From Swiss-Prot:
Transmembrane segments: 16-36, 233-253, 275-295, 315-335
Cellular component GO terms held in the UniProt record: plasma membrane
Family statement: Belongs to the ABC-4 integral membrane protein family. HrtB subfamily.
UniProt entry keywords in alphabetical sequence: Cell membrane, Membrane, Transmembrane, Transmembrane helix, Transport
Positions in coiled-coil regions: none
Function: Part of the ABC transporter complex hrt involved in hemin import. Responsible for the translocation of the substrate across the membrane.
Pfam families: FtsX
The protein, known as: Putative hemin transport system permease protein HrtB
Species of the source: Staphylococcus saprophyticus subsp. saprophyticus (strain ATCC 15305 / DSM 20229 / NCIMB 8711 / NCTC 7292 / S-41)
Quaternary context: The complex is composed of two ATP-binding proteins (HrtA), two transmembrane proteins (HrtB) and a solute-binding protein.
Location in the cell: Cell membrane
Length: 350
């Protein structure tokens, strides 16, 4: 530890440079990761916020909830088996100032209400709870909003981060929803569904039980956005490994005479190796921790309309991957360190 720290202080400008590079790479990785998570939440947060593990939909080759039409006789059979109320959905358009906003309207379902950020859930037929992203347009609890057809609705509450396929969710009471939407898609979010109950539901003609992954994999925007963003993150980790590998390898070559002298006076290779690993960990941790602090600060400053989301688990994952990448990137330096011959390094072989 002492040798590693003394060397960092002696070559401080070189190590500051690599810390800055790691800092910039860390910021880019965390920002793109936060963007990927934010876009993902805009696609599936409505499902993530539910307590259900499975969903009953119309039996289609591609299980898309907006296309799930379940007939009344099928609904009666499903409700007899599951005891669950149906979740109904219909697209609507809000008029906000001079702009129009496409939203997904849902009814209120017992035990499956999205988390409320402010206000209360709608109880009257003319009340709605809106997704918090719509507050960026200046809408708050107590305000009135209009649908495209001119019908006015009062905002009773604000839902916390509830969206589906990039559309904000607007919740109404069951009676209010039925009055306003003559046609709607229907699904049944179910929790603790036993194997026998699932088999009974699947035996109902025209419906089937699906998992959340089955549904999210069929959202076109979800797959189209996540694949390139995840590829960018992987590419940045590869670039980080190459940069760190080149830096520490060059540093090792430049220190060959010093390494030779240390080996000649009896210092074991494992001590030199541990010093190198400590240097890698110190430089990587400092750069990554600062980048985490910067991104965390930015996440609080970004507007609610920005699709950006970071979690503690995601931040810890990135830190862990960076450390692994740094160690992998320094393998060439480890090999060079083992191969240094003390006599040749100090010129004794001439």
């Amino acid at each position: 530890m002492k040798l590693a720290w003394q060397e960092i202080k002696y070559y401080k400008f070189r190590y500051i440079l690599i810390m800055l590079i790691i800092l910039l790479l860390g910021i880019m990785v965390l920002f793109i990761s936060g963007l990927a998570q934010g876009l993902a939440r805009e696609n599936i947060s409505m499902l993530d916020n539910m307590k259900s593990e499975k969903y009953v939909l119309q039996d289609n080759k591609q299980p898309q909830i907006e296309k799930s039409i379940i007939k009344p006789e099928q609904q009666n059979k499903i409700e007899d088996i599951t005891g669950q109320e149906p979740l109904k959905m219909a697209p609507q358009t809000l008029k906000i100032d001079k702009n129009e906003e496409d939203v997904l309207m849902i009814n209120t379902v017992k035990n499956e209400k999205p988390e409320l950020k402010a206000g209360h859930y709608p109880t009257k037929d003319n009340e709605v709870a809106i997704n918090n992203k719509l507050t960026a347009d200046g809408i708050n609890v107590g305000d009135k909003i209009k649908l495209k057809d001119g019908k006015a609705l009062k905002v009773s509450g604000v839902l916390n981060d509830t969206m589906y396929s990039h559309s904000s969710v607007v919740m109404m009471s069951d009676n209010g929803f039925n009055t306003l939407n003559k046609q709607a898609s229907t699904i049944y979010p179910v929790k603790d569904l036993s194997k026998s109950e699932q088999e009974k539901v699947n035996d109902i003609s025209g419906v089937k039980v699906f998992t959340e992954n089955d549904i999210t994999s069929e959202i076109p925007s979800y797959q189209a956005e996540q694949a390139p963003l995840n590829m960018m993150i992987v590419s940045l980790f590869v670039i980080s490994a190459i940069v760190l590998s080149a830096f520490f390898y060059v540093m090792t070559i430049q220190k060959i005479p010093e390494i030779g002298i240390l080996k000649a006076i009896g210092m074991k290779t494992k001590h030199l190796l541990s010093a190198l690993i400590i240097q890698i960990l110190i430089t990587t941790m400092i750069g990554v921790i600062i980048s985490v602090a910067i991104i965390t600060g930015l996440s609080f400053l970004m507007p609610v309309s920005m699709p950006f989301h970071v979690t503690t688990s995601n931040l810890l994952l990135v830190v862990g991957v960076f450390i692994i990448v740094a160690i992998i990137g320094a393998i060439l330096s480890f090999i060079k360190l083992f191969k240094v011959d003390p006599i040749e390094a100090i010129g004794g072989g001439e």
